[in-house]
Amino acid sequence: MTTTNRNNLKLTALTAAVLTLSACGGSDAVAENKNVKPAYLGEVASASYDGISDDLLTAGLGKTGLGGAAPAVVDPLSPTSAELRKLAIFNNYRAILDITAGGGYGTLYGPNVDAKGVVGASEGMIAGTEYIAYSDDGTGRQNITMMVQVPATFNPASPCIVTATSSGSRGVYGAIGSSGEWGLKNGCAVAYTDKGTGTGIHDLQNDTVNVQNGGRASATAAGKASIFTALLTSIERAAFNLATPNRFAIKHAHSQQNPEKDWGKWTLQSVEFAYFVLNQKYGDLASDGVAHLKKLTPANTIVIASSVSNGAGAALAAAEQDTQGLISGVAVAEPEVQLAPDARLSIVRGTTTLVGTGKQLLDYFTLANLLQPCAALVSPSTNVFNTVNAAIAGNRCSALKANGLITGTTTAEQAASAMAALVAAGWQPESSDLQASHYSFATLPVALTYANTYGRFGVADNLCGFSYAATGAATSATPLAPVPASAAVLATSFGTSNGVPPTAGINIVNNNSVGGPLLDAASLSVGGVQDYNIAGALCLRGLVTGTSANAVRVQQGMSEVLRSANLHGKPALIVQGRSDTLLPVAFTGRPYFGMNKIVEGANSRLSYIEVTNAQHFDAFLGFPGYANRLVPLHRYFIQAMDMMYANLKTGAALPTSQVVRTVPRGLAGTAANPITAANVPPIKAVADVADQITFANNVVTVAD
């Protein structure tokens, strides 16, 4: 059973008047610490879930439903908010985790595995109340979605809050399967935010947008309540549609806000929202009989900043920026974090030494976007995500050679040169297996999104000749060209989109393809050659390395997202897979650990855990080519959260920095063996000498 209420947390005009009058009392009254809604928060909507028909963690699907087929929508053109929420939780949970039994779902992790790791027979549904609001500056241009889930097991006598900032560019449910699940199982309130990304899809042809409850509306009707509306006048939009019909603006790419610079701020605001909700629920009434007092504060509440990927980077940023003592400790996995250049730091693994803090995200993504299609030809990966076409990849190799970026006479030599260039740039040799698949599904989408957001480009800028559109089927009258989007796909986009096209039926288009705009991967370069759009790739790279006006804009935005690695002595754990190909350890976890030691010195309480045979996308571990080679990093995320909670609750020591050596599942015939505890040994309290990660004299030494 679900109940909803949009008014129970509003401070009405009457309440405000009562508070004002009570404040006029005599000077002998003791000042009360009243709970006040933060000024940046809009109207708060709430819904309660009974944990039987619906719940906080699985939207009523339970462990079985999350592992099954996508939930049906009765009317695809007009889905209900409840249906969209269920779709969002289903898709976001599965986007983070491997939901195959052989990979550990239902045994190592999952709704039926309790907070102590005990496997149960229940569906793992969690009762409680969910609160949602926008954070905004009054313009409606930000509209950061904030959400707090309070499980029925929350104990105000032993309170805890866990942050769950969305990973990737996902919406507010993006971390439901990572820190969200851990927090709910442990009886903590969970503070979510989409951090200014999420499902903000503006259909420019039809002028429709997403709104907070998941539905779609005309941009005019939505007004300031839109998740995102492109900053175009009606005249500008009409001109854009005439020149480039059937296109879309996407919030993370086109909000012109560079939200990443404020990911720490939004995460801290989500904690403040959680405190407001909890004190409204558990705080005693003030003497006026209307307001509530602050019962829960940072002095008596454990707050763990957490999440994975971009959400993990947001947690680290929040801890760096925390001036109110809101955060007690940090436990994150595979963080997207970018550091100011600092040549004092060196990182050594075996015979390889890298000097400095690593490349910034757009630097290494635009480099990968150039090299990966060619390197794919020698990538050992044979998994289902390797969709690189050998002939087109060969043409990319030729184009790279012509531009002086690789060497070699034959295609094989050129491909080997491209792979060697990636390793020389900082990717670990263990990533070579995954370079092909990452180009197939991740590299260009991320590079294009971040080039746009860092430069604060609008959709009408068509940066580097790229745009977003639905494209026709290969057998249609307009094969692979922009076409009107499916109304049903757009109607359910809140529940299906990951915030970065290609998603929800929206693809990446090369506007400059010879003969007219086409799906980028199939587009034609000068001379009618298919080479994965070398001109577009070179243009994106030039935004990082060049001096053009557009490059200056992008580089300014890049400078705004740099972090300090100063956690102010907070206890912290970072876990990351050595084979991470999306966010390589040489650019993220390793240098963050080293710079934290440099800037904090003896005050540093950060431990860094690097896991062999683990990479960025656990959700892909159920597929051939991934399943037999790699293990779930999520197993170590859970352990890191447990260790951090024990440290904050009882003072238990955090583990020393170390390499955890896992054992791939391998094959039994053509299928991967079921995972066992032997494949994923635990983090040790004290690392063996051969597994230590150490810091001394500004040098991080990582066990090989």
UniProtKB/Swiss-Prot annotation:
Similarity comment text for this entry: Belongs to the D-(-)-3-hydroxybutyrate oligomer hydrolase family.
Q: Name one GO molecular function term.
A: hydroxybutyrate-dimer hydrolase activity
Keyword check for Transferase, yes or no: no
Principal location listed in the UniProt entry: secreted
GO BP: any one term: butyrate metabolic process
An example Gene Ontology cellular component term from the record? Answer: extracellular space
Reaction catalysed by this enzyme: (3R)-hydroxybutanoate dimer + H2O = 2 (R)-3-hydroxybutanoate + H(+)
Entry protein name:
D-(-)-3-hydroxybutyrate oligomer hydrolase
**InterPro entries under this entry?**
OHBut_olig_hydro_put
Give the Enzyme Commission number: 3.1.1.22
Compartments in which it is found = Secreted
Protein's UniProt keywords contain Ribonucleoprotein: no
Keywords linked to the UniProt accession: Hydrolase, Secreted, Signal
Active site: which residues? S309 (charge relay system)
Q: What does this protein do?
A: Participates in the degradation of poly-3-hydroxybutyrate (PHB). It works downstream of poly(3-hydroxybutyrate) depolymerase, hydrolyzing D(-)-3-hydroxybutyrate oligomers of various length (3HB-oligomers) into 3HB-monomers.
Stretch forming the signal peptide: 1-31
Give the top-rank taxon of the lineage listed in the UniProt record for this protein: Bacteria
Cite the annotated pathway: Lipid metabolism; butanoate metabolism
